């Protein structure tokens, strides 16, 4: 029975954070949406931050799963990295909770929201880094600093998907894949 209540609380909190953002969500509101007493929430979660963190931990697992599902062993390394990165950023771009959190961060800059965004970025970087390490071990890519390479790849993707769209028409998936191959996989050398 208590697992059902915890699930109700998590669903209600997710709904509240998605609709109202982190700052405007209160434990009273979550209790009302979950149809439980406020005290029931505190039997599972110490505070709003812990509840928020649990929701985002689950969201990060979903994001990783989407990236894993996008990859196919028969494809070349760079194509799989592109597919995984695109899946991660598309998830981030279309998931209503992440949209709200990034919006709140831009408008208010709440500390808890900034921490969750940093956690999300670290998680994405760790995931990409592990794929780069796998690529180095398999000989698919030449030895490089996996952490730095993951950072560059992520920032390139963010720039192409989010920043470019601020002043230009959105790039399609194939164009982004081609640019990733040009700048990261092949490098800028003419050889």
From Swiss-Prot:
Signal peptide (UniProt feature, chain positions): none
DNA-binding stretch(es), residue numbering of this chain: 26-45
InterPro entries registered for this protein in UniProt: DNA-bd_HTH_TetR-type_CS, Homeodomain-like_sf, HTH-type_Tx_Regulator, HTH_TetR, KstR2_TetR_C, Tet_transcr_reg_TetR-rel_C_sf
Keyword Cell membrane recorded: no
Alphabetized UniProt keyword annotations: DNA-binding, Repressor, Transcription, Transcription regulation
UniProt protein name: Uncharacterized HTH-type transcriptional regulator YhgD
GO molecular function per UniProt: DNA binding
Domain (HTH tetR-type): residue spans on this chain: 3-63
Organism: Bacillus subtilis (strain 168)
């Amino acid at each position: 029975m208590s697992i059902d209540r915890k699930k109700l609380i998590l669903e209600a909190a997710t709904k509240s954070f998605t609709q109202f953002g982190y700052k405007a969500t209160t434990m009273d509101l979550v209790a009302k949406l979950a149809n439980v007493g406020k005290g029931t929430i505190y039997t599972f979660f110490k505070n709003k931050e812990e509840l928020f963190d649990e929701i985002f931990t689950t969201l990060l697992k979903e994001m990783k799963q989407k990236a894993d599902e996008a990859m196919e062993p028969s494809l070349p390394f760079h194509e799989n990295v592109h597919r995984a990165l695109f899946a991660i950023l598309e998830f981030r771009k279309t998931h209503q909770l992440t949209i709200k959190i990034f919006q709140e961060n831009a408008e208010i800059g709440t500390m808890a929201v900034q921490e969750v965004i940093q956690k999300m970025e670290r998680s994405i970087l760790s995931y990409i880094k592990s794929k780069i390490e796998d690529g180095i071990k398999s000989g698919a890519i030449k030895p490089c600093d996996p952490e730095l390479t993951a950072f560059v790849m992520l920032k390139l993707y963010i720039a192409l998907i989010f920043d470019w769209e601020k002043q230009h028409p959105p790039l399609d998936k194939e164009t982004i894949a081609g640019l990733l191959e040009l700048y990261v996989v092949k490098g800028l050398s003419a050889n």
